[in-house]
Amino acid sequence: MQVSVETTEGLGRRVNITVAADTIEQAVKSELVNVAKKVCIDGFRKGKVPMNIVAQRYGASVRQDVLGDLMQRNFVDAIIQEKINPVGAPNYVPGEYKTGEDFSYAVEFEVYPEVELMGLDTIEVEKPRVEVKDADVDTMLDTLQKQQADWKETTDAAGAEDRVTVDFTGTIDGEAFDGGKATDFVLAMGQGRMIPGFEEGVIGHKAGESFDISVTFPEDYHAENLKGKAAKFAVELKKVEQRELPELDEAFIKRFGVADVSLEGLRAEVRKNMERELKNAVRNRVKTQVIDGLLNANDIHVPAALVDGEIDVLKRQAAQRFGGNEKQALELPRELFEEQAKRRVKVGLLLGEVIRKHELKADEARVSALIEEMASAYEDPKEVIEFYGKNKELMDNMRNVALEEQAVEALLANSRVTEKETGFNELMNQPSAA
């Protein structure tokens, strides 16, 4: 077997392989002998068919199978010989084959990038210093009351926290546009669901009134044809409703399954949940900064095959979030997921090198702690812990989480870390890209 390796573009490689004619012929003869032992042909006993007849009837298909097998086996031998680590499925490019002659073919594929970690001491992290204060618990209790509130129709003018039912028709330069019309549209004010200016235009009006609202679509609006466009909405306000907040009494507290149905018991349970969320938020905020710093210091090429695979994963996750239509999700434009997929692949490759460099292995005590922390949010934590312990896939996933945390901590040890006083709501409203 003769082997040569070419670099095509970026991480692309092309291995050229030539298989000697006698190697092919020996393999064909050997396979024909195996076939002769199994075939049944009229006029001959099984296993007694003359080889020339076996070759005449099965030679072409056997030769084709042998060539396919040799191509795969020789490719494996070639990448072992050349110490190549391919990514994804290879593309075989067979050359012209003539009986009795050497056979040449090529295999095209991508390889993993060579990762050399750089700039780890330049990573800067601003760690939030934050605690759950009594005022934060008060705000959360207010939120819980609003979530459990009933709505009562009113003749008052619409306010910033009311719920309204409207009909509207939007136009741009006098022309209607797709998605610009709705009937009996229920809008809870103050949640930022509508484009800027729409809710403000509703405030102060009463049920039964009709009016126009002028707005401008944001430059980053998701619909390309509407970005930055000025629009007018003709609105009919059909109903205004105000919240009726429940009392913070025993009946209200029982809705949340709290053992101690006093207000103090509810506050304690709310605080415990907020502190758990806060711990995760601080951890995620630090992780995001570490990952961002790692990516900024190490701009690596990523194999397209890995990006494609990650895009498929993201599409399936999108399907699970929005109704489970996987077929429809897989048809979504790849551009929607490409940047996130590239980031994930880069992070995986870089953290993989951190793990290799530091010879990290998942800390089983950390794995157990992560499972216990996650299980504490459920009604029966013990049952959840036992379920994880019996499920190898879930345990492996949690070990990967632990290992990733350990890699981030290894990076954090060499990072420039400062602390910043931060409010609970400020931290919880910060996005996390990691």
Curated annotation (Swiss-Prot):
Keywords: Cell cycle, Cell division, Chaperone, Cytoplasm, Isomerase, Rotamase
Disulfide bridge partners, by residue number: none
Enzyme class, spelled out: isomerase
EC number: 5.2.1.8
Catalytic reaction list: [protein]-peptidylproline (omega=180) = [protein]-peptidylproline (omega=0)
Keyword Hydrolase attributed: no
GO biological-process terms attached to the record: 'de novo' cotranslational protein folding; cell division; chaperone-mediated protein folding; protein transport; protein unfolding
Pfam families, A to Z: FKBP_C, Trigger_C, Trigger_N
Record remark on domains: Consists of 3 domains; the N-terminus binds the ribosome, the middle domain has PPIase activity, while the C-terminus has intrinsic chaperone activity on its own.
Family statement: Belongs to the FKBP-type PPIase family. Tig subfamily.
PANTHER family for the chain: TRIGGER FACTOR CHAPERONE AND PEPTIDYL-PROLYL CIS/TRANS ISOMERASE (PTHR30560), TRIGGER FACTOR-LIKE PROTEIN TIG, CHLOROPLASTIC (PTHR30560:SF3)
Function: Involved in protein export. Acts as a chaperone by maintaining the newly synthesized protein in an open conformation. Functions as a peptidyl-prolyl cis-trans isomerase.
Protein name as annotated: Trigger factor
Organism expressing this protein natively: Sodalis glossinidius (strain morsitans)
Gene: tig
